[in-house]
């Protein structure tokens, strides 16, 4: 499930490789020193993204809202990044822009090296279907369809010529097995618990093998225990399969277990917190390890 490759671009603005930052480097032994200069593929890059909402024509209120005000960051292939911030901080707008659901006022968004907002609406819709998987707080499953049909639906919608219906059937069942609910494949979502429905939603997000999975408060409708189980599944996907995940959450405890947290306030990045793991030096994690220490904080002025 890993995606992407290191791309060599001449233009610095389009540089989709990144060298491990020495400020965030873990100490390494002699046999690991080569990792310090390794380049790491970037799945997502935002460059000075702004989103401004102008007052509607005829509206009595003439307030201009800067929902996003110069947001720039990168997400590496296989990284699990959490977006944290108070209500109204711009988190939802940011996720909508990353997910190509809304165009920015200015700035660039690159997914797998492609400047997606240079595309027209038709091609942008195709990119959204092929490269992005969505997980919503409210699951957004279709109750008249079976669990398996829900998982397969994005593949059917995409109508990929390279993928047959039998391929989609097989992949859907494989994903349901990985997520521990293959035995529910023929049931309807309404017959499942909240945690099981969110597992179906995760499988659906992965069916087209996306470059990026966007999760909007995926544990928000679940109790603490079930929410942690769902989060652990997302963490497993990054650790075991190299899935790239960007998650919006209000849960600071869960955010602290992701690879990196980006705090946003008033449409700007306030700070980034790097939760150090083996992945920070280019080494795949052997298991889903809880990171108890926050070792590096980068304040963004």
Residues covered by each model-derived region:
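ABC family nucleotide-binding domain
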Residues: 41-257, 261-264
């Amino acid at each position: 499930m890993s995606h992407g490759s290191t791309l060599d671009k001449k233009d610095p603005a389009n540089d989709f490789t990144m060298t491990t930052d020495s400020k965030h480097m873990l100490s390494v032994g002699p046999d690991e020193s080569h990792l310090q200069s390794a380049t790491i593929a970037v799945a997502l890059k935002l460059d000075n993204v702004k989103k401004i909402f102008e007052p509607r024509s005829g509206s009595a209120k003439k307030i201009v809202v800067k929902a996003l005000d110069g947001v720039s960051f990168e997400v590496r292939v296989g990284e699990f990044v959490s977006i944290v911030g108070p209500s109204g901080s711009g988190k939802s707008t940011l996720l909508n822009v990353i997910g190509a659901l809304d165009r920015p006022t200015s700035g660039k968004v690159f997914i797998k090296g492609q400047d997606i907002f240079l595309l027209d609406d038709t091609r942008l819709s195709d990119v959204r279907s092929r490269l992005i998987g969505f997980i919503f707080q409210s699951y957004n499953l279709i109750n008249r369809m079976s669990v398996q049909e829900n998982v397969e639906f994005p593949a059917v919608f995409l109508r990929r010529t390279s993928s047959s219906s039998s391929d989609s059937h097989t992949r859907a069942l494989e994903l349901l097995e990985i997520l521990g609910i293959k035995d529910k494949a023929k049931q309807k979502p309404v017959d499942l618990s909240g945690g099981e429905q969110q597992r179906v939603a995760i499988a659906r997000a992965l069916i087209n093998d996306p470059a990026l999975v966007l999760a909007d408060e995926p544990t928000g409708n679940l109790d603490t225990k079930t929410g942690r189980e769902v989060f652990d599944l997302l963490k497993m996907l990054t650790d075991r399969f190299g899935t790239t995940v960007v998650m919006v959450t209000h849960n600071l405890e869960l955010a602290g277990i992701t690879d990196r947290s980006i705090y946003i306030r008033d449409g700007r990045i306030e700070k980034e917190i790097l939760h150090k793991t083996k992945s920070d030096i280019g080494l795949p994690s052997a298991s889903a390890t809880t990171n108890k220490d926050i070792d590096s904080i980068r304040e963004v002025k």
